[in-house]
Amino acid sequence: EARDLGLGRLDGPRLLPYGNAGRGVYCGGMIQSNFSVVILAAGQGTRMRSDTHKVLHPIAGRPMLLHLLSTVEELGASRRIVVVGKGREQLEAALEGHGVETAFQAEQKGTGHAVQMARDALHGFSGPVLILYGDTPFVSGETLARMLERLAANDRPGVVVLASSPQDGKTYGRVILGEGDHISKMVEYKDANEAERAVKLCNSGMMAVDSADLFDWLAKVGNANAAGEYYLPDIVMIAKEEGRTPVVIEGEPFETSGVNSRA
C-alpha cells in the first residue's frame, strides 16, 4: 500500500533526488555513461481499483512512471525500455515523445519472464542493465549510481541487488547475507521458512546486471515455486553457481516502497 514516507509535501526534487549524477553516472570519481534501463510495468495493478494504468497514477501531479523515467534520463541511460502488458495502449500513449522503447508481455508469468521480453530491445547492447519497477518511483539517482559503480568493481559480482530494511517487511522476499556485502541466499516470502522470514533485509526487486550474462541466466530460471512463476531474483543463485559473487546495496526504505493504492 502507499506509505506515509515522512517527506512532507512531495515536490519534484525532493521526491527524486539525483545526487551528483548529471549526464552519465558520476559516483566516487568514476563515470559510467553506457548503461540501459528496463522498467517493468506489465502488472495489472488490480488493487488500485481504477481504469487508469497503475504506473500512470499521479504523484505530485505527474504520473509515477514519468518520475522514474526522469531519474534515469538524468543519469544518462543509453536505452530505456518499458515492459508493458494489459493497458499497453494507455502506456504507449503516455510514453510518446519520451524516447522510450516498449516490450510486450502477453502473459503474466513473473518478473523473470517480464525481463526476457526486453531481449530484442537490448539486442546489440553491451553494458550494465538496471532493472526497475514502474510502481516504485522513489528510488534516487544516487542509489542507482551506487548500484552501477558496485557492478563495475574489480571483483565483478555480476549482480547487484537493491535491498532495504523497512519497519514492516510484510511479504517481501528476504536477502540472506554471507561475508561482507555478498549474498548467501535470496528467497521469496512464500517460499521462506520461519528463520528466513525473521531476516530484516528485504529484496526490492531492483537490480543491476551485466547484459552479457542477463539473458543466459534468465534462460536457466525455472518456475518450481509456490506461485509457479519465473522469479527474476533466481538469477542471483544461478550467478553464484557459475562462480560469481552477487552483492547487495542497501537503500533507504522509502526508496523501495511500492505504490499499491490511490491513498
Feature-to-residue mapping (PLM):
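Short, structured coil segments at secondary-structure junctions
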Residues: T52, G76, E96-G99, E179, ...
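Extreme N-terminal basic, low-complexity initiation segments
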Residues: E1-L16
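Conserved N-terminal catalytic core of the sugar/cofactor nucleotidyltransferase
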Residues: Y18, Y26-S36, R62-E149, N154
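Catalytic-core segments of class I nucleotidyltransferases/pyrophosphorylases
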Residues: H182-A263
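Short beta-strand/turn micro-motifs composed of small residues
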Residues: A41, V84, Y133, A163-S164
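Rossmann-like NAD(P)H-binding beta-loop-alpha module
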Residues: T143, S164-A195
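Glycine-rich N-terminal loop/short-helix segment of MobA-like nucleotidyltransferase
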Residues: S33-I59, L75, L95
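A short, conserved acidic/glycine-rich loop-to-beta-strand motif
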Residues: N154-S165
